Regions:
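Short acidic/polar active-site loop segments enriched in Thr and Asp
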Residues: 104-105, 205, 224
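Non-catalytic positions within long, well-ordered alpha-helices that form the structural scaffold/packing
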Residues: 99-100, 200, 219
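Zn-dependent metallopeptidase/amidohydrolase metal-coordination segment
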Residues: 209-247
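Generic non-transmembrane alpha-helical segments
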Residues: 11, 15, 161, 165-176, ...
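His/Asp/Glu-rich mid-to-C-terminal helical/loop segments that flank catalytic regions of hydrolases
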Residues: 236-272
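Metabolite-binding pocket within alpha/beta catalytic cores that recognizes anionic/polar moieties
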Residues: 1-154
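Metal-dependent peptidase/peptidase-like ectodomains
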Residues: 143-182
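Active-site/ligand-binding-proximal alpha/beta "capping" segment
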Residues: 169-205
């Protein structure tokens, strides 16, 4: 794995003149942020050695390097999901490469089903913590000290200072945000009413099929992390409704302007 990480990082360095210190994974609901990146340089995943290729509708599959306001960033447009058949090492490989490139702050986004009765469709949830219910752990197997410690500490998986900054940005722009715990599951089925009840009772506020593996690997490598979910459907007891991928994308698209504004201003505001 170390050789693959090195090979991929060297390929990117050879094709990108100025590697940033900040990266963002553009999940469902944050695709519009690409339109705010200037001086762009794009590399399709299929051209990058050892990179998997995303198969999900709405995830296009390329690395974008450019300027977002006053910050130079790397944006990952299209992520890899465990339910697509990739191993956890493949799902999290891009995060390993980010660390090898010298990136030290990671912003992640996703679409999620809300389980907190206070949530509404279209809400933006700042992730304060997560519950990992994936059947395989991304750090399972041999540990390489070059990548991080055998037993990483996870008491602050999501940066407290970035959470505070994001809340300020939302307040300054009169945007409603909620906070909560994200439950990560493998998918690809949406949750049953009983699963929604269970996930909420064990402490979850929203549930989705991504993010947790990437965050674990980022923290393993010592990166600072900020995460945000757009609530695209509700699994609140008594009002669970049928949901489809198309409906999730539609709800995420409606929330994009608010989510984009928060992320853009937060990235510009924080100190690397």
């Amino acid at each position: 794995m170390l050789e693959k990480i090195k090979e991929t990082a060297e390929y990117i360095k050879a094709h990108v003149s100025n590697i940033p210190k900040t990266a963002i994974i553009l999940g469902t609901g944050l695709v519009e942020l690409v339109n705010h990146i200037t001086d762009k340089q794009e590399i399709p995943y299929q051209e990058i050695p050892n990179f998997p290729i995303s198969t999900v509708e709405g995830h296009s599959g390329k690395l974008i390097f450019g300027q977002l306001g006053n910050k130079r960033i790397m944006a990952m447009q299209g992520r890899f999901h465990f339910y697509e058949g990739y191993s956890m090492q493949q799902v999290t490989f891009p995060v390993r490469v980010m660390k090898a490139l010298g990136i030290n702050t990671l912003f992640v986004s996703n679409a999620a089903g809300g389980m907190n009765p206070e949530f509404k469709i279209g809400d933006i949830m700042i992730i304060t913590d997560h519950i990992n219910l994936f059947p395989e752990h991304p750090l399972r197997g041999k540990n390489y000290e070059e990548l991080g410690p055998r037993f990483p500490e996870m008491s602050e998986a999501y940066s407290h200072r970035l959470i505070a900054d994001a809340k300020k940005v939302a307040e300054e722009n009169n945007i409603r945000v909620v906070e909560g715990v994200y439950v990560g599951t493998q998918g690809p089925t949406f949750e049953t009413p009983a699963e929604y009840r269970y996930f909420h009772r064990i402490g979850g506020d929203a549930v989705g099929m991504s993010t947790v593996p990437e965050v674990i690997v980022a923290r393993h490598g010592g990166m600072e992390v900020f995460g945000v979910s757009v609530i695209t459907d509700l699994g609140v007891e008594g009002i669970v409704e049928k949901v489809s991928h198309e409906e999730v994308q539609k709800a995420a698209a409606l929330a994009q302007p608010k989510m984009t504004l928060i992320m853009k201003e937060l990235i510009n505001k924080f100190k690397e």
